[in-house]
Amino acid sequence: MLINLSAVWAAFALSGVLAPPTWPASIDELEDLMFLNTGYHARGFSAGVTPCSFSQQGPSRVASAEWVRTAFHDMATGNSFTGVGGLDASIVFELGGKGGENIGAGFNTTLETYTPFFSTRSSMADLIALGVYTAVRSCGGPVVQVRTGRIDATARGPIGVPQPENSQGTFINQFTRMGFNVSDMIAVTACGHTMGGVHASNFPQIVVPGSAPNDFQLFDSTVSFDEKVAVDFVGGVAGNPLTSTTAKRSQRDADMKVFTADRNVTIKALADQVTFRSTCARVLQKMIEVVPSGVNLTAPIAPYEVKPGRLQLSLASNGSTIAFTGEIRVRTTSRPVTSISKVELVYKDRTGGSSCGSCIITTEYKGTAEGFDDSFAFYGFEARFPVETAISKFNVRVVLNTGETVVYNNNDEEDDNRLIISQKVRKNANTGSVKLSVTTKTPRSCCVTPALTTQSVPMSPQTTVGPYTLYAGNLTLAAAYRSNAKFDVSLTSGGAVISDSFKNTADLSSTCAPFGSNDPTMPDYTFDGCYTDTPESRALTSAAFVKENMTIAACSSLCKGYQFFGLEYGTECYCGDTRSNSSMQAPKSECNQPCGGDSSETCGAGYRIAIYKDDKWVPITSPQIPGYNYTGCYSDSPSNRTLSGSFTYNEKMTVELCASFCNGTKYFGVEYFSECYCGANMFPGSTIQPESDCGFFFSANKTQHCGGSNRINIYTKLDM
């Protein structure tokens, strides 16, 4: 595997509470997960608890409550006096058998939901903490500040999770061990029990089977995060299963014991909305900050005002130039995107000078993303520099429609407050040793979550291109890991380590070629014609991309795996296996707009798309699953799932793997790259859709389709 060695780095430090962070920082991955819920580059961490009452597991489950409960159970065995235990993801190892102190399927489900986001930069313990913020905000609750830096346990922790049959004195002693006084014990219990409820299958002495819908009794009558649980208790309103006469008979009326521990003083105060929200924000943050001694938490995560992303330095033009690509994310919470005229990078060359002239890199608008409380706009760029001058640092300049200019300098009071970008490895430099490290998620038999396994190999110099030396390293990966592993390239010299880290193996080419090869290659596609196209009825609907430097070859690469690709308006690229019947052929002369990246080529025009066909395309067929027929592409939605039985998410998902997971159910279906659903019945409102709507590929298998956005491929069991 040939690795382009480029390191983009900067020193970082977190300052006071909620101060603007300095990029890059240890929080960067979790900051994205926390704030990019929907839209462009959305991470989707909040999808599992959106809306508040939602659960992939069906109507008797509330994922938001399960996320909060998982954090409490993980933390609850901690000892604030000895510094042992706390929120350290030891719960991963504590779910064997019947669950012990952790009864119910919600813990495994929660950990499985977090697994796709688990990485070297987002520990499982930090994800559990982030889950509390996400679940509470999704349900309309207050902001629970999240500090990061938790270290995952490697074995089960001590016992000591509070159980409903405990006495009031035992509860007080257990919470004292955790670091909570009596008032905070009452508050954190009420804040945790404002969502969710009790399952009869888990606690039949508390909820008698058959006595509640779906054998699931809620703590109060609302699904949102509110003070209702406290209001009901103070007002004597029945409903909370942990204060009921049924629970009292078996001495499992846990909320009654806890709420009355200070003669109702705290629970009465919590019946006030303002008090409830402010108190819950405080005690839930306190809960997720019970950590083992030796763990140093960062300042609370705050959103960047301006955040660079996807930065890459690459040799180009046979080593005569350096290409610099990336994106700038601008926070638009208090400054709408419509007020921004342009975003620019103002840079210095290698020596810190301005021999580049104006030294400005322009950007183009890419899209917007939203979180619970913030919004963001993304601006992409691509620039090239002579290798002799290159680039060393830059500021970000935001120009508003009013003419006002705001310059962001990364909080660096020294060196003109600019981001620092390292040089490439020059052949006259003392390079020291270069190493390639690849991290994969390795399944383990003990737990539902994988382990992170890192393999490292030395890289050796291969050739020189201009003033640079190229290095290569070879490391074998199983096919299942090739599309979702992370890799780092590090240079150690004179005791200092510079690394280009947390890169996706999915971004690498599937084949290696000598750098600067000029061997002619024949394209694998032919021109299919010029066609009409409109935003309301696209000719190709499976995928879409916009690049300012678009070319025919670039669009072909972006649409690899699809039968057709098409170019429009100079910079737009569309993909699909079928062409819409609403798109009519037009004269070739009407597809006359030059491509943004090569003016000698044409890339469609306004409402005209130049379509090409992949000559080596192999039709994607639904695999034959013994005992099942492929039924078709159906509509689906998070609020009314087509199949509402079991669910699993797996980055290695295939049709065969989903069939195995569903284990003989009448229906199973695949959707949205990696999702698998099972069910005995189909939702009546789900309707058959065009096959082109189910044009997504599996994340790790480009030979099978995996539904689409709100579209699911359904397989039906044969009548025997």
Swiss-Prot record:
- Signal sequence span is 1-24
Question: Glycosylated where?
Answer: N4, N108, N181, N264, N296, N318, N474, N549, N581, N629, N640, N663, N701
Q: Is Signal found in the keyword set?
A: yes
Specify the WSC domain's residue ranges. 524-615, 627-718
Gene Ontology biological process terms, A to Z: response to oxidative stress
Query: Which terms are listed as keywords in the entry?
Result: Glycoprotein, Repeat, Secreted, Signal
* Single GO MF annotation: heme binding
Q: Pfam families from the xrefs?
A: peroxidase, WSC
In terms of one coarse class, where is the protein primarily found? secreted
- What GO CC terms are in its UniProt record? extracellular region
Query: Which InterPro entries does the annotation name?
Result: Haem_peroxidase, Haem_peroxidase_sf, Sialate-O-sulfotransferase, WSC_carb-bd
**Subcellular location field:** Secreted
Question: What SUPFAM superfamilies does UniProt report for this protein, alphabetically?
Answer: Heme-dependent peroxidases
Listed PANTHER family = WSCD FAMILY MEMBER CG9164
The family this protein is said to belong to: Belongs to the WSCD family.
Q: What is this protein called?
A: WSC domain-containing protein ARB_07870
In its UniProt entry, the species of origin is given as Arthroderma benhamiae (strain ATCC MYA-4681 / CBS 112371) (Trichophyton mentagrophytes)
